[in-house]
Amino acid sequence: MPYYAALGLDVGRRRIGVAGCDRLGITVQGLTTIVRRDFASDVAAISAIAKERQVELLVIGLPYSMDGSLGSQAKQTQRFATRLSKALQLPITYVDERLTSFEAEEMIKAEGRSPSRDKGAIDRKAAALILQQWLDEQREPRRFGSTQH
């Protein structure tokens, strides 16, 4: 049985949603939302979580445009992810995160909560959806993805 030690990250301009999974990859949960200040602070916060959870891979949501192209936000996310990977000495892989924030917001509404009152909850749930999508892809017949270091 595979062993999973991954963090899911929903990287935004203001916040980073962080999600983790159990070692068997069965359950995924939002862990925290990091309010972004500068790169060093982002790295320190993610590093602390990664060390505590003995993470071996960062799964990062890549916000493709609806037509499948990489827009400016996706390119910024890639630049951040590359720097983060080097700083933490951890490999990264990307997951198409189109509509995860929208889906997360709808899930929060379905729970009877107000998404506008807790933007961090949306980010955490979006990160959980990103990580869940990656886990689901790992269970599919083997396809070689875009893992990079």
From Swiss-Prot:
Q: What is its EC number?
A: 3.1.-.-
GO cellular component terms attached to this protein's record? cytosol
* Primary location class: cytoplasm
Please list the GO biological process terms of this entry. rRNA 5'-end processing
Which compartments does it reside in? Cytoplasm
Coiled-coil annotation: which residues?
A: none
Task: Fetch the CDD domains from UniProt.
Answer: YqgF
InterPro entries reported in the protein's UniProt record: RNaseH-like_sf, YqgF, YqgF/RNaseH-like_dom, YqgF/RNaseH-like_dom_sf
Q: What Gene Ontology molecular-function terms does this entry list?
A: nuclease activity
Enzyme superclass (EC): hydrolase
Keywords per UniProt: Cytoplasm, Hydrolase, Nuclease, Ribosome biogenesis
Claim: Metal-binding is one of the keywords in the record: no
What the entry lists under PANTHER family is as follows:
POLYNUCLEOTIDYL TRANSFERASE, RIBONUCLEASE H-LIKE SUPERFAMILY PROTEIN (PTHR33317:SF4)
The record's similarity note reads: Belongs to the YqgF nuclease family.
Provide the function of this protein: Could be a nuclease involved in processing of the 5'-end of pre-16S rRNA.
- Name of this protein: Putative pre-16S rRNA nuclease
Q: Which species is this UniProt entry from?
A: Synechococcus elongatus (strain ATCC 33912 / PCC 7942 / FACHB-805)
